[in-house]
C-alpha cells in the first residue's frame, strides 16, 4: 500500500516496501502515480518514492540562466540547495520511515529539467548509484561546456538516457539542439568509461510517460529480481 510523506512542502509518494536494500527516487511531474509505483515496485523489486511539489524551473537548474523560450522567467539556479535538501532531510527521513537498510542502493530517475538535475548531481556526488534521464534538458545554457571541462568521475552504476524522436524538431531554437546536446553528453560519458544505455523512442518531450518510466526501470533493474 502506498503512503504519502510531506517534507518541506515536498510530497513524497512511497510504494509498498518491496525491498529494504534498493530504493528508487523519481522526480516526475505526475501526481497520479499510485497505481504505477505499486506495479513497478513489484515488477522491478525496488521500493519507489515519487517526489512532487518542486518549483520545477528553479530547483533543477544548476546555475542562473536566461529563461527559455525568450520572455520566460529566468532560471534561478537552485539545484545546489535542492541537492542539499535531498541529502540532509528528504532522503534520511524517507529511508528512516521506510526502515531501509543502512547500505541501501539508491537510484534517481528524472525527466526534462529533473533529468538535467539527475546528471548534474551524479557528476558531483555519489548519493545515487545509477540514474535515468528521460528527455534531459541538456540544452540548458552552459551545461555542455560545463560537462566538457568537468572531471567526470568513475561511477559504480550506470546512466540510462532516453529521447523522443520528435524533440529535435521543436520550434524553439534552444530546445531543438537537444538531440545534438544529448549525443555530446553520451560521447563524453562513454569516453570517461561510464556505463551508459540510450534509447530513442517515438514522440515528443512528454509523450507516453508511463512506458518511458518502465523503460528506465527496466534498464536500472534488468534482472527484475525481488528481495
Predicted feature locations:
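Serine-hydrolase catalytic machinery in alpha/beta-hydrolase-like enzymes
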Residues: 11-13, 19-99
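Alpha/beta-hydrolase fold nucleophile elbow
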Residues: 99-111, 131
Amino acid at each position: 500500500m502506498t503512503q504519502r510523506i510531506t517534507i518541506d512542502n515536498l510530497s513524497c509518494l512511497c510504494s509498498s516496501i518491496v525491498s529494504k536494500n534498493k530504493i528508487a527516487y523519481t522526480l516526475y511531474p505526475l501526481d497520479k502515480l499510485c497505481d504505477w509505483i505499486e506495479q513497478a515496485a513489484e515488477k522491478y523489486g525496488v521500493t519507489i518514492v515519487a517526489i512532487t511539489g518542486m518549483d520545477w524551473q528553479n530547483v533543477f537548474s544548476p546555475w542562473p540562466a536566461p529563461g527559455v523560450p525568450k520572455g520566460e522567467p529566468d532560471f534561478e539556479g537552485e539545484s545546489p540547495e535542492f541537492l542539499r535538501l535531498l541529502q540532509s532531510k528528504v532522503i534520511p527521513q524517507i529511508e528512516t520511515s521506510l526502515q531501509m537498510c543502512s547500505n541501501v542502493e539508491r537510484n534517481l530517475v528524472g525527466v526534462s529539467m529533473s533529468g538535467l538535475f539527475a546528471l548534474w548531481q551524479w557528476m558531483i556526488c555519489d548519493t545515487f548509484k545509477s540514474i535515468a534521464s528521460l528527455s534531459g534538458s541538456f540544452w540548458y545554457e552552459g551545461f555542455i561546456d560545463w560537462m566538457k571541462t568537468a572531471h567526470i568521475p568513475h561511477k559504480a552504476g550506470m546512466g540510462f538516457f532516453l529521447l523522443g524522436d520528435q524533440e529535435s524538431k521543436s520550434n524553439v531554437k534552444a530546445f531543438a539542439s537537444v538531440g545534438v546536446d544529448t549525443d555530446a553528453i553520451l560521447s563524453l560519458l562513454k569516453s570517461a568509461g561510464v556505463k551508459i544505455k540510450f534509447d530513442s523512442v517515438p514522440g515528443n518531450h512528454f509523450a507516453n510517460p508511463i512506458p518511458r518510466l518502465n523503460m528506465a526501470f527496466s534498464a536500472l533493474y534488468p534482472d527484475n529480481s525481488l528481495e
